[in-house]
Regions:
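Short low-complexity, flexible loop/linker segments enriched in glycine and/or proline
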Residues: 79-82, 100-101, 151-152, 192-196
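A short glycine-rich, Lys/Arg-flanked "PGG" loop and its adjoining helix->strand segment in the class I
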Residues: 118-133
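Hydrophobic/aromatic residues located in beta-strands of well-ordered beta-sheets
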Residues: 63, 134-136
């Protein structure tokens, strides 16, 4: 009996369901075009609909997509783009050594265990010619929005990969000039939209000099003993007011520092969703 559950095209259908579209993909992927400016032949591993392949072709680059999703392959062929419907690792293992100028892969490595990622990078190094470049884009582990939202949206995600870890893998298999960074194109309004600069609460400092000085009318004053108690009480209250003034001043200073502290915190965690690692084969 055949399995009634058909998972063919599941990834493609999911991306359409969540609203991923060509316009957004082109905007996000355009950031990586300068890395391949001097390349003649570039392969996009896990190319999906082929939006980056299309961008490369428009730049005069001989671009090829590789994706195991048959529906994505059909869509690419319908657009007149070159596609090999094959697993990315299998493709790299079989392609002629030193035949590629560039390799690009966006949001593939997070679907793989680290052993497979290392294999992918190893065979990518083999496939590239001297001076060839590789770029690997993946969810940004520095971004809070990745951990709280976007990373968990896809059923196939296996692990975050810190770009420095990817750089280590790249270096270990023989790549050099490895660097990493963030792609600012994808929107990431997680904390920025929730936090607005607000002036700190204004509490008037208590200035003892503004208290009105009044003379005591001795003829109409209460008995001396009562007056003495009243004077002691007044001194105590003034002492407390003076101490409160210092507290209010300190609180105001802390409130004044709060926006800068919040900006620093937001800058550290409200990062772009996508990061990348890149390197060159010597």
């Amino acid at each position: 009996m055949s399995d009634p559950i058909d998972l063919t095209g599941l990834d493609y259908d999911y991306l359409r369901y969540t609203g991923v579209n060509a316009a957004d993909q082109r905007k996000n992927h355009s950031f990586y075009l300068p890395f391949f400016r001097d390349c003649r032949r570039v392969v996009d591993l896990g190319c999906g609909d082929g939006d980056f392949v299309q961008l490369l072709v428009e730049q005069g680059v001989e671009a090829l997509g590789v994706d195991s999703d048959p529906i994505a392959a059909e869509k690419m062929r319908a657009r007149g783009l070159s596609i090999i419907a094959e697993d990315a690792l299998t493709y790299l293992q079989n392609v002629e050594a030193g035949s590629l100028d560039g390799i690009f892969s966006a949001h593939l490595v997070e679907h793989l265990r680290y052993q497979a990622v290392y294999q992918l990078i190893f065979y990518a190094n083999r496939a590239l010619k001297s001076g060839g470049r590789i770029v690997l884009a993946t969810p940004n582990p520095h971004a809070l929005i990745s951990h709280l939202d976007l990373y968990w949206l896809h059923f196939g995600h296996v692990s975050f990969y810190h770009p420095r870890l990817l750089c280590f893998f790249l270096h270990r298999v023989g790549f050099r000039s490895e660097t990493w960074g963030e792609n600012p194109a994808p929107p990431h309004p997680l904390l920025g939209s929730l936090y607005h600069h607000q002036a700190p609460p204004q509490a008037n400092s208590i200035d003892p000099g503004r208290f009105e000085r009044r003379s005591i009318d001795w003829e109409a004053s209460p008995p001396r003993e009562k007056l003495s108690r009243w004077r002691r009480s007044l001194r105590g209250r003034l002492a407390r007011l003076l101490g409160l003034d210092d507290i209010v001043r300190q609180v105001n200073q802390e409130f004044a520092q709060l926006p800068a502290d919040m900006d620093s915190l937001i800058d550290r965690v409200d990062r772009p969703f996508e990061c990348f690692a890149t390197a060159v084969k010597p």
